[in-house]
């Protein structure tokens, strides 16, 4: 006899929506949640208080928005769900701007999924340095479904996979603060080849040597 959920999925999993800035991550989160309304599925959205761009709402750059609950940290999500304010008919939890939470969000997401909640998470995959942002690398491992979106490179029009930060027209230094809330005044989406981070350190002793070698090789080829 086939197992009970051979052709359907038991409720309780994690969906991750990620990518660079201007890729439509929040818009996709809102779209998925709005879609559930056709099936009369109730949901609740949380976001970190550090995101000051739209108080008490998650808002996409296309203008769509949803009410949300701001929390100081990930465990507050569990506390709210255990409180008298929580509607027990809610089975879907949305979490936006997940990169601003610490690693405790991974445990929160797993606990929710293990207890029958569908958890839909959105956030940046990389910081301005091009490195995993906050808990995102671990969430890649924990997520049951992953959607990686791209934007359009502001420099060449190719698919953009990185978020570039500039301050007063200058590239942000590798040692600059990781979190700097802002939009187009500081950031643009770029492809790998137009992503610049001055003073980025290299772990391998011969990495810089290889970069110089390859640049010289290309230069000599064009002579």
Curated annotation (Swiss-Prot):
Gene Ontology terms: biological process: DNA biosynthetic process; thymidine metabolic process
Residues holding ATP: 19-26, 96-99
Name of the top EC class for this enzyme: transferase
Short name of one Pfam family: TK
Single GO cellular component term: cytosol
NCBIfam families registered for this protein in UniProt: PRK04296.1-1
Name of the protein described by the UniProt record: Thymidine kinase
Source organism: Ureaplasma urealyticum serovar 10 (strain ATCC 33699 / Western)
Gene that specifies this protein: tdk
């Amino acid at each position: 006899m086939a197992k009970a959920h051979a052709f359907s999925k038991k409720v309780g999993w994690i969906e991750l929506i990620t990518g660079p800035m201007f890729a439509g991550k929040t818009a996709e989160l809102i779209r998925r949640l709005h879609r559930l309304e056709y099936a009369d599925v109730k949901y609740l959205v949380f976001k970190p208080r550090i995101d000051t761009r739209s108080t008490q709402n998650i808002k996409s750059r296309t203008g769509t928005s949803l009410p949300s609950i701001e929390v100081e940290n990930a465990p507050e999500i569990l506390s709210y769900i255990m409180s008298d304010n929580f509607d027990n008919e809610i089975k879907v939890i949305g979490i936006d701007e997940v990169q601003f939470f610490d690693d405790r969000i991974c445990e929160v997401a797993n606990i929710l999924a293990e207890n029958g909640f569908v958890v839909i998470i959105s956030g940046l995959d990389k910081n301005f340095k091009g490195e995993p942002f906050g808990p995102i690398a671990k969430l890649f491992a924990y997520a049951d479904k992953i959607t990686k979106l791209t934007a359009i490179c502001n420099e060449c029009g190719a698919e953009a996979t990185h978020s570039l930060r500039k301050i007063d027209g200058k590239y942000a230094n590798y040692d600059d603060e990781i979190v700097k809330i802002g939009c187009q005044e500081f950031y643009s989406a770029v492809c790998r080849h137009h992503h610049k981070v001055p003073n980025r350190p290299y772990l391998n002793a011969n990495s810089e040597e290889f970069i110089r070698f390859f640049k010289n090789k290309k230069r000599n080829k064009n002579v």
